[in-house]
């Protein structure tokens, strides 16, 4: 199975301006993400950016980078531009790896690509991980997903879904027998679907939840979800996240790449 990786890397960030260029043990964050993506076995890794500084940084390391429009509403829209400009065939599998996840497990990238390859009925694939603690379920910054019996996403939400009414009413923890899944923000698509996605009308529900993948479900497409044993890596959204990731890379450089 062959697949490509596209890393959307916007310069603007409300909390950490220029986030893709922040230093992590001597390399820009986006370069760390590229290295993890290459370790997944991807046939091609492309950074899609909207800023010349990111373009210059990636090029200086000899990696593939493409300037894209600054007007895209989401990373998926940015990736769709790459697919169109590169002329990739409709059946090409493209994995969206977030540019702020320098600790992402390369095996997870391959797992999600493989999941989509194995499910011809799905237009997209993503991943989830079982949650074991009530605070995480109640945390709106942790997105939850509910699956059908074929492993397709029924819905994504920042709310606790499914809601264990009786257990929570009795101040109990998560009841056994009904796993609650944390969505992991990695996506695989077929290039042909990305061309169609760019023309899909945004849905009110995606704005309400601030979750772009809901547009796909709203329009009736299927998303196959890989249940992984690999806990999601720490992304970088705050100064505290950045400090943690730096400490992990510095202390375990040989393990990380």
Swiss-Prot record:
| Pfam families xrefs | CTP_transf_3 (PF02348)
A GO CC term attached to the entry: cytosol
Which Gene3D superfamilies does the record associate with it? Spore Coat Polysaccharide Biosynthesis Protein SpsA, Chain A
Question: What are its GO biological-process terms?
Answer: CMP-keto-3-deoxy-D-manno-octulosonic acid biosynthetic process; lipopolysaccharide biosynthetic process
What InterPro entries does UniProt report for this protein, alphabetically?
Cytidylyl_trans (IPR003329), KdsB (IPR004528), Nucleotide-diphossugar_trans (IPR029044)
Pathway as given in its UniProt record: Nucleotide-sugar biosynthesis; CMP-3-deoxy-D-manno-octulosonate biosynthesis; CMP-3-deoxy-D-manno-octulosonate from 3-deoxy-D-manno-octulosonate and CTP: step 1/1; Bacterial outer membrane biogenesis; lipopolysaccharide biosynthesis
Substrates-to-products reaction catalysed? 3-deoxy-alpha-D-manno-oct-2-ulosonate + CTP = CMP-3-deoxy-beta-D-manno-octulosonate + diphosphate
Q: Which UniProt keywords apply?
A: Cytoplasm, Lipopolysaccharide biosynthesis, Nucleotidyltransferase, Transferase
Going by the record, the broad EC class of this enzyme is transferase
Domain of life from the UniProt record = Bacteria
Cytoplasm recorded as keyword: yes
Enzyme nomenclature, EC number: 2.7.7.38
Location relative to the cell: Cytoplasm
UniProt record similarity statement: Belongs to the KdsB family.
**Name the UniProt record assigns to this protein:** 3-deoxy-manno-octulosonate cytidylyltransferase
